[in-house]
């Protein structure tokens, strides 16, 4: 018969100090309850005796202990843990009785309670942090499913152990323990396959009794019960609002029950299908964990929770299989430990257990997630130096007052959505909370992991725009200028007798009304313009003044009327001039009066009345010689036109070009898209080609005055030298450098022309920064006239004969690549400044050479004008006519930015189309991962990437979308040639422009990763540019200089004339990803001292608050110091120093100017 014995060892005590009288313990997969107490994997109550009567809690509690079980003097099992509780019982003649509770070190987590935020970490990573904080390093994970990062995971007002159990249950993790000498290891698993298995099967013995040396199982009962048969979970994500996220999982082994027991729940706490499917299966496993169970008893001490074993010798063959121990209770008695006190009887051991079949997975009971009781207050945070920090969805980062671990910066939280008053598809209301604003945060379904900002509040520092309650009757919408001083405001005053609507624009105030605008003012109207006022009325103007009208002009007044001028007064009409009145008519002047006409000068006069003609003067001369006097003549200047407004339209569905088609079109030197015609609203009338519309009606209550006559167009129109920009001294219009003529070309704008030429041809639109303008600015030459309308093939008959003067600009560069660049660029310029004309009426060009060597070409309904090589040719009726004046090169020098060795219309189009640049980014992964990228692929990739970052012109994107919708497919096929397009599938350019919805572009952008893209192309980019990049050019742009013509002909950027880097230089900035490829320059910028880095997060927050208070109350002292500080850092001045300065900079000021106060703060 086998003999049993028990012993225990406690840290710090001699091995023989304590003897085991008995024990009662429980083990379970994950947590359970034992004797009314929480059991975190295992819990043992051990009865002890000792000859030492004065053992104290200090010697026992929180110490490591190990209970050992011997069989035939061989150690067969051990339980290692910590002493949670210790008690002293009776003191006998020889022994004192004690009792201790042995638990895992994991139970220490139940004594910690916390609130904090974990970001972008997997559940195993979070659990590891919890364990390591308590000094628990003996743990392991055996997981079948890869952990998915949780964007935002909050431990909210719960103990560390509850938080651990909640996360583990959500991910389907269970834990058990492996006991070894001197330690116990916490073991996490998510499948029964990962559990340890006993090396030997355990026999089953139905006939309990007698002396059996081998441990066995008896009293095994197998139980089957009906449970949930199907789980269906559902959730929602704002990133995919139309997607259902519905997940359904059907149970197995359901032959014994109905299959209609569905468990539905929402939200399912997932945001993608992969997690949704896993969570649904975990939920089903939990709900069916009692469907197939077994209970039994044994005397095998090797049985432990979290272990598998094989059963044998059962009379039912189906029971002889593998099983998983889910929970087990152990009992042991050792009465002979007290033989001196009369103890007698054999040492015994037994256990009772619960099992599940080995192929099933046990899931822990899901723990309830803490619910947030109500709204919270938080502060909007972001990087130092920023005022507004948001993402593409308008989400912001926030910091909660209870968050002790974050530094109150952009790492404090996930992106948090912001409730807006109105949110539709590209319409609604948007107001981004700014850094430092206090916001009200609520939580979807009370879930602390799903915060949403639902309101904003003022506090003692952020006060309302007007003092209260003094201005309690005001309703105000006031903004604040970003990175500057000022505000925009719309406010309403509702005090009786003082009602007012107030509107303040810090800079410009623009408005666009698509139809009528009616204003009724029932009292006075005052208008003060402190600079110029421009008004343009494109149809009729009716003005009725029912009392008197006065005008005072301190300078000159010019009135120019193309038609007739009719003036009618009811009584007297008086014209008085200080010096001269000059009346001139082309044919006749008639002055008629009912009773009298008098002409008076000096003392003489001529009077005509019914009595006759009376002449009176000192001397009356008739036919005595002399000459008539002359007047000054008309010398008035024409009024300038007002700045226009582009309509705020939604993005039209754009179109993309396949990358392969781009390369093919590039090789063929042909346009990839049709030239953009003028839109209807941009088209300007040819002379005498427009019938004026009837005058528009004027809304009541005032009756419209009757027009005297309808205006008629004249043959000598003044030039329209302006568009939607302000005039500058050197040229009529000025466009921002970010467009560099691209917007102008898309809108049908071309280069400037002299005023006399503009008069001759009616109208012309000009654009400073246009490529040809940059070449011809000094000579003020080069012109092109668009047709009056190119809508649906109409109005071709209104084309006039126009002069195009292309300036001869001989090539001075020997580099073959540079010469080719100019040829290709001129090809683009010429083909984009023409359009398709009526096929039946085009004529060849007639070359005329001017005396100064320039080309003067008469264009009469030409189909194409193409400049290439050393001549200019016209394609007409299948013939090519080349015209080259003697001794001159026709190649025009290229000064337009962005033209590299592949100066093709396709790449030019890329530069002007932000939506295309963005859509191309989705192709980077496959393009940049290919081996042996050639220069063309690399150039296109880098070019598109850089332009997508640095040419984000929203209005341009909108405009481009409008125009591309109005383009018609090119009528002719792309003709293959020896060098280019040979793909028979691509028959015209329109086939490579499939439409792409704006929402799709947004989706592509959200998935793109610029850094990953740059990582792929970095080696090729570095090898291409690192050695040949000109240091002088880079420094030239750093110093604010401009390469002539915004191009690369006067500044060699590498040996490839890179369009990518030329664009960067145009913006005088280089992204961090490319800095390593640029020449290093000596930097005089000092590094900023980071005083606050020395403090822990709690201390840092306190220091920042006190420093901020000192700075805000410093008057202008801090502002002056900050200005000198920025000067020392080679940074430009700012106006709002207290808002722009970082916390470290403010701390530096306190330390320098008030060191005693600084020492008090940090102490």
Swiss-Prot record:
PANTHER family, A to Z: PTHR32305, TYPE VI SECRETION SYSTEM SPIKE PROTEIN VGRG3 (PTHR32305:SF11)
Places the protein is found: Secreted; Host cytoplasm, Host cytosol
NCBIfam families associated with the record: vgr_GE, VI_Rhs_Vgr
Enzyme class: ligase
E.C. number: 6.3.2.-
Entry's Gene Ontology cellular component terms: extracellular region; host cell cytoplasm; host cell cytosol
Required cofactor names: Mg(2+)
Occurrences of domain ACD (ranges): 728-1163
This protein's name: Actin cross-linking toxin VgrG1
One function term, GO molecular function aspect: acid-amino acid ligase activity
Functional summary from the UniProt entry: Part of the type VI secretion system (T6SS) specialized secretion system, which delivers several virulence factors in both prokaryotic and eukaryotic cells during infection. Forms the spike at the tip of the elongating tube probably formed by hemolysin co-regulated protein/Hcp. Allows the delivery of the TseL antibacterial toxin to target cells where it exerts its toxicity. Also acts directly as an actin-directed toxin that catalyzes the covalent cross-linking of host cytoplasmic monomeric actin.
């Amino acid at each position: 018969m086998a003999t049993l014995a028990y012993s225990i060892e406690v840290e710090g005590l001699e091995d023989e100090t304590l003897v085991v009288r008995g024990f009662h313990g429980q083990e379970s997969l994950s947590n359970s309850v034992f004797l009314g107490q929480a059991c975190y994997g295992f819990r043992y109550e051990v009865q002890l005796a000792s000859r030492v009567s004065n053992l104290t809690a200090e010697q026992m509690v929180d110490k490591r202990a190990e209970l050992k079980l011997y069989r035939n003097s061989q150690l067969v099992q051990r339980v290692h843990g910590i002493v949670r509780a210790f008690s002293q019982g009776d003191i006998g003649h020889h022994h004192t009785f004690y009792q201790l509770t042995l638990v895992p070190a994991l139970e220490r987590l139940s004594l910690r309670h916390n609130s904090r935020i974990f970001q972008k970490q997997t559940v195993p990573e979070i659990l590891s942090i919890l364990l390591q904080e308590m000094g628990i390093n003996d743990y392991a994970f055996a997981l079948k499913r890869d952990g998915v990062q949780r964007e935002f995971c909050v431990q909210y007002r719960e103990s560390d152990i509850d938080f651990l159990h909640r996360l583990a249950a959500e991910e389907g993790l269970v834990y058990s323990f492996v006991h070894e000498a001197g330690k116990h290891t916490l073991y996490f698993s998510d499948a029964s396959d990962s559990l340890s298995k006993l090396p030997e099967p355990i026999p089953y013995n139905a006939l309990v009794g007698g002396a059996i040396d081998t441990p066995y199982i008896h009293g095994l009962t197998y139980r089957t019960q009906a449970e949930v048969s199907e789980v269906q979970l559902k959730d929602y994500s704002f990133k995919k609002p139309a997607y259902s996220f519905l997940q359904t999982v059907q149970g197995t082994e359901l032959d014994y029950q109905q299959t209609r027991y569905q468990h539905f729940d929402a939200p399912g706490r997932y945001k993608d299908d992969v997690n949704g499917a896993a969570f649904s299966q975990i939920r089903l496993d939990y709900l069916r964990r009692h469907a197939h169970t077994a209970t039994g008893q044994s005397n095998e001490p090797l049985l432990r929770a979290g272990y598998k074993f094989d059963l044998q010798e059962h009379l039912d063959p189906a029971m002889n299989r593998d099983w998983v121990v889910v929970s087990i209770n152990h009992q042991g008695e050792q009465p002979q430990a007290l033989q001196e006190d009369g103890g007698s009887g054999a040492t015994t051991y037994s256990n009772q257990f619960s099992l599940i079949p080995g192929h099933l997975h046990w899931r822990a009971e899901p723990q309830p997630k803490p619910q947030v009781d109500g709204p919270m207050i938080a502060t909007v945070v972001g990087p130092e130096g920023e005022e507004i920090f948001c993402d593409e969805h308008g989400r912001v980062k926030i910091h909660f007052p209870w968050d002790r671990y974050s530094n109150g910066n952009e790492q404090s939280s996930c992106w948090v959505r912001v409730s807006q008053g109105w949110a539709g598809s590209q319409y609604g209301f948007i107001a981004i909370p700014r850094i430092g604003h206090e916001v009200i945060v609520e939580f979807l379904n009370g879930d602390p992991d799903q915060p949403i900002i639902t309101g904003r509040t003022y506090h003692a520092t952020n006060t309302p725009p007007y003092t209260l309650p003094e201005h309690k009757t005001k309703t105000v919408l006031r903004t604040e200028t970003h990175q500057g001083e000022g505000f925009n405001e719309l406010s309403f005053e509702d005090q009786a007798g003082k009602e007012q609507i107030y509107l303040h624009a810090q800079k410009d105030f623009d408005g666009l009304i698509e139809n009528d605008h009616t204003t009724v003012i029932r009292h006075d109207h005052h208008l003060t313009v402190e600079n110029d006022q421009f008004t343009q009325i494109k149809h009729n103007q009716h003005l009725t003044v029912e009392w008197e009208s006065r005008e005072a002009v301190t300078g000159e007044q010019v009135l120019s009327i193309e038609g007739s001028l009719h003036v009618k007064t009811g009584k007297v009409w008086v014209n008085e001039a200080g010096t001269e009145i000059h009346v001139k008519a082309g044919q006749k002047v008639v002055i008629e009066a009912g009773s009298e006409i008098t002409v008076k000068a000096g003392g003489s006069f001529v009077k005509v009345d019914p009595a006759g003609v009376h002449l009176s003067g000192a001397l009356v001369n008739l036919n005595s010689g002399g000459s008539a006097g002359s007047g000054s003549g008309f010398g008035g200047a024409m009024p300038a036109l007002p700045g226009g407004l582009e309509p705020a339209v939604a993005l039209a569905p754009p179109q993309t070009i396949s990358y392969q088609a781009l390369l093919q079109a590039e090789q063929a030197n042909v346009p990839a898209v049709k030239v953009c015609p003028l839109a209807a609203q941009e088209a300007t009338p040819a002379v005498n080609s427009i019938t004026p519309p009837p005058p528009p009606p004027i809304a009541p209550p005032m009756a419209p005055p009757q027009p005297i006559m309808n205006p008629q167009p004249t043959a000598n129109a003044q030039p329209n030298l302006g568009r939607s920009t302000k005039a500058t001294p050197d040229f009529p219009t000025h466009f921002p450098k970010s467009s560099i003529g691209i917007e102008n070309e898309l809108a049908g704008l071309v280069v400037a022309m002299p005023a006399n030429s503009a008069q001759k041809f009616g109208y012309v639109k000009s654009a400073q920064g246009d490529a040809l303008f940059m070449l011809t600015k000094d000579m003020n030459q080069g012109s092109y006239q668009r047709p009056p309308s190119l809508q649906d093939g109409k109005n071709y008959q209104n084309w006039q004969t126009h002069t195009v003067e292309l300036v001869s600009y001989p090539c001075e560069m020997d580099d073959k690549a540079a010469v080719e660049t100019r040829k290709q660029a001129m090809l683009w310029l010429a083909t984009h400044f023409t359009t398709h004309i009526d096929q039946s009426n085009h004529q060849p060009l007639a070359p005329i050479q001017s005396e100064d060597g320039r080309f003067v070409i008469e264009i009469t309904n030409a189909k194409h004008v193409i400049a290439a090589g050393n001549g200019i040719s016209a394609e007409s009726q299948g013939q090519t006519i080349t015209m080259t004046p003697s001794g001159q090169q026709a190649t025009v020098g290229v000064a337009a930015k962005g033209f590299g060795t592949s100066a093709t219309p396709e790449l030019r189009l890329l530069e002007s189309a932000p939506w295309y640049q963005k859509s191309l980014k989705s192709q980077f992964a496959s393009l940049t991962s290919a081996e042996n990228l050639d220069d063309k692929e690399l150039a296109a990739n880098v070019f598109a990437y850089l332009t997508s970052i640095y040419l984000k012109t929203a209005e341009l994107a909108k405009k481009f979308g409008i125009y591309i919708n109005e383009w018609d497919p090119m009528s002719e096929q792309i003709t293959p040639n020896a060098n280019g397009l040979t793909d028979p599938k691509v028959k015209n350019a329109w086939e490579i422009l499939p439409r792409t919805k704006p929402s799709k572009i947004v989706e592509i952008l959200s998935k793109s990763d610029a850094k990953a893209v740059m990582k792929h192309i970095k080696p090729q980019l570095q090898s291409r540019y690192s050695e040949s990049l000109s240091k002088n050019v880079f420094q030239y742009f750093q110093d604010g200089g401009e390469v002539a013509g915004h191009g690369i002909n006067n500044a060699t950027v590498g040996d490839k004339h890179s369009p990518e880097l030329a664009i960067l230089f145009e913006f005088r900035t280089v992204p961090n990803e490319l800095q390593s490829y640029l020449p290093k320059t000596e930097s005089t910028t000092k590094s900023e001292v980071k005083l606050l880095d020395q403090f822990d997060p709690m201390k840092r927050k306190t220091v920042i608050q006190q420093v901020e208070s000192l700075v805000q109350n410093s008057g202008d002292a801090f502002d002056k110091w900050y200005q000198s500080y920025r000067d020392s850092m080679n940074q430009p001045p700012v106006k709002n120093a207290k808002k722009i300065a970082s916390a470290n900079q403010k701390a530096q000021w306190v330390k320098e100017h008030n060191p005693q106060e600084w020492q008090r703060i940090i102490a």
